[in-house]
């Protein structure tokens, strides 16, 4: 059985998709089988990771939207490969916004993904990572949280609004656990876009220590030109420059993630 993690934050631009891509890639490099489910209609994660996004996703009609349009199809039927042999993708497209409106009219709008997550898929992967959009009302966030074991809050140290939005996400998670029966645990928050010796970054880190009662990770992801260049080239930082300092940051964060999960998961093979 796989371990499912949903990345959350109500604010855009905090590095949620970048984290999904690079942590997923680093886990794959460590010989874990990983599936990333891209639930953001911007499809940045899908375009970055997919071997040939236009051919394999758009032309072949293998996206989450196409899966949800069908009545008898499952995750396994729509998974596409990435450039890493251990990392697969359930891709997004610009149509996902319209799909979100569509599933609101279903009799069970919050379990559309759960109903299509097949046993074959769960048994194949060690990790399933859900990359979510920033909108608090998005049904895909509810869908992801319901079938996840953990949620992981991503915070940008250059944007105080990411912290101000936390109570809204806390309410979403409370609703999902109390009203929808989800059993989900927090992972210590990850701070991204960190600038050393920067007053705002220092302030945000100190605020995070107070606000997140389940803690923050020791690892931080620094804000670097190389990270921005790798994103512009539609590559993970490990492909663009695996020796970069920010690549080391993501490696530390991934290792810390595994240690955290080891403490709570008996089924994780380490």
Tell what function each PLM region has.
Residues 1-270:
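P-loop NTP-binding core
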